[in-house]
């Protein structure tokens, strides 16, 4: 389906409310998406965002901009979540290699090849540090979405 020549009409049964306002048709494209993302991704607080001015600049109604902003943030959160998953999977595979290496070292210690013992407290400290780093990265998607919704007051 081509977006340039496709129109969708929806007919809803019943009367329109008295205060119903027909929205003006507008065109939305990837260029406007990029402009919206650059503006909303840099705001520090909700007071910094003037939705009416932004709507006038982009030629779109305010409710659409808020919904689109939410969608853009949601997409960015998915990308971030995927990056965190990839990072944690990479770390867990490297940790499994380290555990194999530790087992080999312990076997070597038990044999007569090595005359000294490996300090196990160093290994425990390293494992605890890496697991605490992973726990700092794990933020639930719903918590990030809730924070976003609070920020945008949607």
From Swiss-Prot:
GO terms for biological process: autophagosome assembly; protein transport. Pfam families: ATG29_N. It is found in: Preautophagosomal structure. InterPro entries: ATG29 (IPR039113), Atg29_N (IPR040666), ATG29_sf (IPR039362). Keywords: Autophagy, Protein transport, Transport. Coiled coil: none annotated. Disulfide bonds: none annotated. GO terms for cellular component: phagophore assembly site. Plays a role in autophagy. Functions at the preautophagosomal structure (PAS) in order to form normal autophagosomes under starvation conditions. Also plays a role in mitophagy and regulation of filamentous growth. Belongs to the ATG29 family. PANTHER family: AUTOPHAGY-RELATED PROTEIN 29. This is Autophagy-related protein 29. It comes from Kluyveromyces lactis (strain ATCC 8585 / CBS 2359 / DSM 70799 / NBRC 1267 / NRRL Y-1140 / WM37) (Yeast).
């Amino acid at each position: 389906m081509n977006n340039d020549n496709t129109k969708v009409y929806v007919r809803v049964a019943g009367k329109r409310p008295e205060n119903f306002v027909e929205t003006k048709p507008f065109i939305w494209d990837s260029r406007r998406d990029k402009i919206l993302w650059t503006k909303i991704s840099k705001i520090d607080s909700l007071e910094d965002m003037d939705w009416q001015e932004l709507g006038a600049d982009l030629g779109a109604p305010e409710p659409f901009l808020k919904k689109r902003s939410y969608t853009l943030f949601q997409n960015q959160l998915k990308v971030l979540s995927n990056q965190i998953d990839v990072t944690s999977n990479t770390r867990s595979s490297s940790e499994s290699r380290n555990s194999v290496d530790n087992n080999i070292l312990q076997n070597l210690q038990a044999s007569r090849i090595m005359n000294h013992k490996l300090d196990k407290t160093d290994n425990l400290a390293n494992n605890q540090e890496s697991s605490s780093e992973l726990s700092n990265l794990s933020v639930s998607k719903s918590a990030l979405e809730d924070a976003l919704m609070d920020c945008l007051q949607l």
